[in-house]
Swiss-Prot record:
Its EC number is 2.7.7.6. PROSITE patterns: RNA_POL_BETA (PS01166). GO terms for biological process: DNA-templated transcription. NCBIfam families: PRK00405.1 (NF001616), rpoB (TIGR02013). The gene is rpoB. GO terms for cellular component: DNA-directed RNA polymerase complex. This is DNA-directed RNA polymerase subunit beta. DNA-dependent RNA polymerase catalyzes the transcription of DNA into RNA using the four ribonucleoside triphosphates as substrates.
Length: 1373
């Protein structure tokens, strides 16, 4: 056996990784979790459960929906359709083919269903199985997720955004005194299910409790309690305690003394011990709870109260006549003076009354007596009348409706989360599998609501992240699936009842279109399925990690208040407090924090390190907001000694409610993993974030997402250390799938022989086809460049090719440029930016943008449209870029108005008959009359044609261009196949050679003699095919050769088969929309150089527009002659408080000066003035321990590393744990610069020094996607609105500029009457005047006449619509 790990080059690719000088002090224990895990886990793992065997699938996602909808039975229970299992076929087209052909990337869902037919005996009613049919049924194509967490729908990449919504469960709150004029708090409760009716409970101003179902008319709460089967006695006994008053002869009543019921007040009568008769306190004296407890402790059990004390109390049971047992008063009735006289007359000795006091109000009792419904039937009918007004209420219908509302699993679902939340809030212990309401739930909700009113407990905070959960992709699509399957269930039942069930197969019953249409509708039109923001890799990642409170079942931006949008203490480590849009969506659309993840219940969790006895361990625990409230959590920057013990007498900790307390080290339960866990990915890319104002940091995070990928990428000198993670997880770069050795590299693809052996011991081959000049969703350019060389050894997950906006595996959204802060002739007034000509000349900020144009040749009723070069009335000059078919060549330079694809459409006075159509088809006649409908380059676009794609309908003959493109693609596929085969052959034949050398030949080709011993030289003279003809003596060797031959043939056959399938797919024609014969797509790439009007920004929210490009010789320059690239206005800093940019500039200044110092050392080393030790010493002083791995390598590699940092030393200053001002000064000193970071600058125009020192340094700037080329627009003549006859507005309509009301005032103020008349007539909507003006211009005259503007006629028509006739009377002057 040959080992694949032989002859591996010593140098792995990981040696090329960039090393940054890291200023962070906190040791990272946890890695950043995969940034798009939230999308992939939710959909693939939890919803589809792809690649999991049927028997091992958990009851969640698709499996649980199918289990809940099936079995489906018909009305008579004769037929029963059961679900067995489901599986997915392989998708017809891969991701790339789907995006090229405008198709959806989806896999067919095959569900195995079992149809059981029963025989029912009409007399006995017994059932017997008559027959069982099992069949695999196609249920439509289900969109699959790409490896980057997106969906391809109709050829475009889309993202399904996760939604934040209120968690199911019960919530208690009050109106904050806003409803009632007195400011009285009205408490209410709401039960929110996952699906089903909402139940609201509320107090009114008179302290009566009501309930509503689905916000309908309110009813008394006791109606609901009676409906769930409680009697008056049960209601009173459940919600109230009872106390007995015993008659004491001639003295009054003795009653139990309960100190808990005593509040501080002055006594109106004496406090007398009923057992001893002692007076403990006189009337008028004050009693307090503490004094009451003291008396109770001293043995006071019963107290004596006056006879009339009972008046106003409520009975806790029926009052009966001791002699006749007749009911004198019912439970809950108030004792009046008359009733007291009856009690005295009948000598009733014991009276039981309700305990009602300030801690236990009479609300339920009052509601009970206000409610007219006295039994369950009346209560149910009352509820029925509210929910179904106008329908006759009978008890069966009412009972069925009430059961279906809250107790039917089909219609009401609290979900597991809802049940957990309900149990915890109401202190119940009901099984998590019970996801409907129970009687206990309702009773206890009322209990908790009344307790809140009595001042016990606290209301819920709706914005607490324990009360808001996240619905990710999987769950959102699961809900759509359920809707689709429920609709399908109805059609299945109809079909079962309609046809002869005995002859039907399962596929006859199922109509998959219903299901497919619901899923399609979700992906195409839902507010949460969004066109992916693909401006750059960061914007992609951020879009996938977005949390939206909007969307179906969420909030609407008009009704969302301030509280929902605000930052909540529980957002810490879960939702970024910085990154959110400016504008009306602020706070409603958020971004997940860097380390956050979503647990199985949909709550966001954040990681913490466990602290045991004051020692910080490396154990990382993820806590949700609910769990976190129970612990004391320290900050990540708490001081820790070498042994991990927390230092200091007290540690600052967060506790529940977002408050901070100081506790001793042994009381701390957890500490943060890293300070970076607070912010999102975009915010974690901002160095010195801690020195920026939050508003500017917000703008900085948002603007990084708008940075355009540039031609030349450049990772920031001053980074935060997260750049590599973002590039890796975004999917922009290419990662190695396995360990391996690079066999071939060119700009289009990388071939790697992997080191993971297959079962037969042969290597597998990974071929990575790189994306070249592809168009992104936002017309930016996706282009991948290889980072590896032939012979490199790569490890799994190494980055082997850079994508857009990445540089050596790190995200690189902009460029490092030399910046000076000083005013320059007013050209950088109000955030304007002044740039040097060098930046334009050297393409520093040049980007490529790709536009796609499409033309469709359709079959019209006058005959087919044709793509051709033969276009009527078009000059040969205009056709110069088209090939013989009429399609533009690749590489052609085009400008606005040029023809891209020639197309003619038949036009005729009358439609042609079928006979004519047939004759034309037979004799090949062209249409008599055609019009030009070619695809032209639209206005404002120019560039180079980089790609052309031609799609032809199946059965339509392909033209030469389509055949040429197809041939090109087949050649590419063949090359991939041949290269893979070559690597396998190389391996197989070198293995064969090892086996054969030294063996004795028995039989073989002509060139060899029998009995000879095989040598390497002998084998070199044979062709590869002749190796198999050799037979040797050793039987074991022959067996092994036979095995190798079998494996080799299988491998070759599999490769050929795969190639044939792909070729067949290419040649088979395309699925085009109805009526389309041919589709041609043309891609034009445009280079956008930086120019005045383009918007630029830094990472700190400092944005501006370019005002002027200045020649290099006029720009300020340094004393060594270096010209400054960009001049910014220093006045943009103080008021905006984003000081991080200044620290970045200073550290950038240190970076390039340290690089110069290293270059000088390398020069001296080459000139033999110094040894390698001095270089090592300087590198250790600069990088610290980070550099040890490099210093252990040979001298050439150390020098090669020094050359890599010759442009600038790369720093990492992690957010909230980065470089302090002193660190920046130390770096400046090490670089031999003034620690102030300021230098003398010379004015390029005068050659004189500026008066003061100027802050100069390297700063990272981005070019944003707001390019002046896409915004600038002008019009002389163009389209007019049909009704008003005024020019249209906006660039997309080629419109004019509106001369509005205020502009008219300006002309009136100047008295410019003629100009005003011209603006309001001929330049606007005076149709005749326009024509006359044109005539006079053509004749060379300068005068014009204005007539009546069309708007005047429109106004007259509007008057007429109001039945007012207005006539214009023209009087001759």
């Amino acid at each position: 056996m040959v080992s694949l790990r032989d002859n591996i080059e010593a140098q792995p690719l990981s040696h090329n990784r960039r090393i940054r000088k890291n200023f962070g002090h906190i040791n990272l224990v946890a890695d950043i979790p995969n940034l798009i895990e939230i999308q992939k886990n939710s959909y693939e793992k939890n919803f589809l459960q792809l690649n999991i065997k049927d028997s091992e699938r958990k009851n969640k996602g698709l499996q649980s929906i199918l289990n809940s909808i099936f079995p489906i039975s018909d009305s008579s229970n004769i037929a029963n359709l059961e679900f067995v299992k489901y599986e997915f076929d392989t998708p017809k087209y891969d991701v790339e083919e789907c995006s090229q052909r405008s198709l959806s990337y989806a896999a067919p869902l095959k569900v195995t269903l079992r149809l059981s037919i029963w025989d029912i005996d009409e007399d006995t009613g017994t059932r017997e199985i008559k027959g069982i049919k099992e069949q695999e049924v196609y249920m439509g194509d289900i969109p699959l997720m790409t490896k980057n967490g997106t969906f391809i729908i109709n050829g475009t990449e889309r993202v399904v955004v996760s939604q934040m919504h209120r968690s199911p469960g019960v919530f208690f709150y009050h109106d904050e005194g806003k409803v009632h004029s007195s400011g009285k708090l009205l408490y209410s409760a709401r039960v929110i299910p996952y699906r089903g009716s909402w139940l609201d409970l509320e107090f009114d101003a008179k302290d009566v409790i009501y309930f509503r179902i689905d916000r309908k008319r309110k009813l008394y709460i006791t109606t609901l309690l009676r409906a769930i089967g409680m009697s008056t006695e049960e209601i009173i006994k459940f919600y109230y305690n009872s106390v007995t008053y015993k008659l004491v002869k001639n003295k009054g009543w003795a009653v139990k003394f309960i100190p808990q019921h005593i509040t501080a007040h002055r006594l109106t009568s004496d406090l007398v011990d009923a057992d001893t008769g002692n007076i403990l306190l006189k009337a008028g004296q004050k009693i307090t709870p503490r004094l009451a407890k003291k008396y109770f402790g001293e043995g006071l059990n019963n107290i004596l109260v006056a006879h009339e004390t009972l008046i106003g109390k409520y009975l806790s049971e029926d009052l009966r006549d001791p002699t006749s047992d007749e009911v004198l008063a019912k439970i809950g009735e108030m004792i009046t003076a008359d009733m007291l006289n009856v009690i005295n007359a009948l000598k009733i000795k014991n009276v039981n009354v309700l305990v009602i006091n300030p801690q236990s109000g009479p609300y339920i009792r009052n509601t009970l007596f206000a409610d007219k419904n006295q039994d369950r039937e009346a209560a149910l009918c009352d509820i029925f009348r509210v929910l179904r007004p106008g329908e006759p209420a009978n008890i069966e219908a009412a009972e069925s409706l009430f059961y279906n509302l809250f107790f039917d699993v089909e219609r009401y679902d609290l979900s597991e989360v809802g049940r957990i939340k309900m149990n915890s809030r109401l202190e119940l212990n009901i099984s998590e599998e019970v996801t409907v309401l129970t009687i206990d739930d309702i009773k206890n909700i009322v209990r908790v609501l009344v307790e809140l009113k009595d001042g016990k407990g606290i209301i819920d905070d709706i914005d607490h992240l324990g009360n808001r959960r996240v619905r990710s992709v999987g769950e959102l699509i699961e809900n759509q699936f359920r809707i689709g399957l429920v609709r399908m269930e109805k059609s299945v039942i109809e079909r079962m009842s309609a046809g002869d069930v005995d002859t039907v197969m399962p596929h006859d019953l199922v109509n998959s279109k219903i299901l497919v249409s619901v899923v399609k509708e979700f992906f195409n039109t839902s507010q949460l399925s969004q066109f992916m923001d693909q401006t750059n890799p960061l914007s992609e990642i951020t879009h996938k990690r977005r949390l939206s409170a909007l969307g179906p079942g969420g909030l609407s931006r008009d009704r969302a208040g301030f509280e929902v949008r605000d930052v909540h203490p529980t957002h810490y480590g879960r939702i970024c407090p910085i990154e959110t849009p400016e504008g009306q969506n602020i706070g409603l659309i958020n971004s997940m924090a860097t380390y956050a993840r979503i647990n199985k219940h949909g709550f966001i969790e954040s990681p913490y390190r466990r602290v045991k006895d004051g020692c910080v361990t490396d154990e990382v625990v993820y806590l949700s907001a609910i769990e976190e409230g129970k612990y004391k959590i320290g900050q990540a920057n708490s001081k820790v000694n070498k042994d991990g013990k927390l230092q200091g007498e007290f540690i600052n900790c967060r506790v529940e409610g977002g408050n901070f307390v100081m506790v001793e080290p042994y009381e701390v339960d957890f500490i943060d993993v890293t300070p970076m866990q607070v912010v999102s990915v975009a915010a974690s890319l901002i160095p010195f974030l801690e020195n920026d104002d939050a508003n500017r940091a917000l703008m900085g995070s948002n603007m990084q997402r708008q940075a355009v990928p540039l031609i030349k990428t450049d990772a920031p000198f001053v980074g935060t250390g997260v750049e590599g993670v973002v590039a890796k997880d975004s999917g922009a770069s290419v990662l190695a799938l396995h360990d391996g050795i690079v066999e071939q590299v060119d700009s289009n693809r990388i071939v790697i022989r992997t080191l993971e052996q297959k079962v037969d011991g042969s290597p597998s081959v990974d071929i990575y086809n790189l994306l070249k000049f592809q168009k992104s969703n936002h017309n930016t350019c996706i282009n991948q460049k290889p980072l590896v060389k032939v012979g490199h050894y790569v490890k799994k997950n190494d980055i082997i090719a850079d994508g857009p906006s990445t540089d050596n595996g790190e995200i690189a959204l902009g460029r490092n440029v030399l910046v000076a802060f000083l005013p320059w002739n007013g050209y950088n007034f109000e955030d304007s930016i002044l740039i040097s000509e060098r930046i334009v000349k050297e393409d520093v900020f040049t980007s490529i943008h790709i536009e796609e144009f499409e033309v469709i040749a359709r079959d019209t009723r006058l005959g087919p449209e044709e793509i051709t070069r033969d276009i009527p009335n078009v000059s040969e000059e205009a056709l110069r870029h088209l090939d013989e078919v009429g399609i533009i060549y690749i590489g052609a330079e085009v400008k606005a108005g040029d023809i891209l694809v020639g197309k003619v459409t038949p036009k005729s006075e009358s439609p042609i008959t079928p006979e004519e159509k047939l004759l034309r088809a037979i004799f090949g006649e062209k249409a008599f009359d055609v019009k030009d409908s070619s695809l032209h380059v639209p206005s404002g676009v120019s560039g180079t044609v980089v790609e052309v794609r031609v799609f032809s309908r199946r059965g339509v003959e392909k033209d030469q261009r389509a055949i040429a493109i197809e041939k090109q693609q087949i050649e590419k596929l063949a090359k991939d196949r041949d290269d893979e085969l070559e690597i396998i052959e190389h391996f197989v034949f070198s293995w064969l050679e090892k086996l054969l050398v030294g063996q004795v030949i028995i039989n073989g080709p002509k060139q060899v003699k029998v009995g000879q011993t095989i040598t390497t030289e002998m084998l070199k003279g044979l062709s590869k095919g002749q190796f198999w003809q050799i037979t040797v003596e050793d039987a074991n060797v022959m067996n092994e050769i036979e095995q190798i031959k079998t494996h080799y043939d299988e491998k070759k056959e599999a490769l050929d088969k795969r190639f044939a399938t792909k070729v067949e797919k290419l040649q088979s024609g395309d699925d085009l929309p109805q009526g389309a014969l041919k589709v041609v797509k043309v891609f034009i790439a445009t280079k956008h150089k930086l120019q005045p009007g383009d918007k630029m920004a830094g990472r700190h929210g400092n944005k501006g527009v370019i005002s002027r490009i200045v020649p290099e010789e006029d720009m300020p320059f340094l004393e060594d002659g270096t010209v400054v690239d960009i001049v910014l206005n220093p006045l943009g800093l103080p008021s905006r408080m984003n000081i991080g940019q200044i620290l970045e500039t200073h550290l950038g200044w240190a970076s390039i000066n340290l690089a110069k110092k290293i270059s000088t050392l390398v020069k001296e080393y080459k000139n033999k003035h110094i040894g390698i030790e001095q270089i090592k010493k300087f590198l250790i002083e600069l990088y610290g321990e980070n550099i040890n791995s490099i210093l252990e390598r040979p001298e050439e590699e150390i020098i090669s590393f020094c050359k890599k940092v010759s442009k600038g030393v790369h720093f990492a200053t992690p957010v909230f744990d980065g470089a302090k001002v002193q660190d920046v000064k130390d770096m400046l000193k090490l670089a031999g610069q003034d620690p102030s970071g300021q230098v003398k600058l010379i004015d390029g125009r005068t050659g004189e020094y500026f008066d003061r020192l100027v802050t100069v340094g390297q700063k990272y700037l981005l070019k944003l996607h707001h390019l002046v080329d896409n915004k600038i627009h002008s019009r002389s003549i163009g389209p007019y609105s049909l009704v008003t006859q005024q020019p249209l507005g906006g660039k997309s309509h080629f419109g004019g500029q509106r001369f509005g009301e205020m502009e008219c005032w300006a002309l009136q103020a100047y008295g410019a009457a003629y100009t005003l008349q011209e603006m309001l007539t001929v330049k606007s909507d005076d149709v005749n005047g326009r024509i006359k003006t044109y005539d006079s211009i053509v004749r060379g005259e300068n005068n014009f006449e204005s007539g009546i503007p069309e708007s005047f006629n429109v106004m007259i028509k509007e008057f007429r619509s109001l039945c007012l006739n207005v006539k214009l009377e023209v009087t001759s002057s």
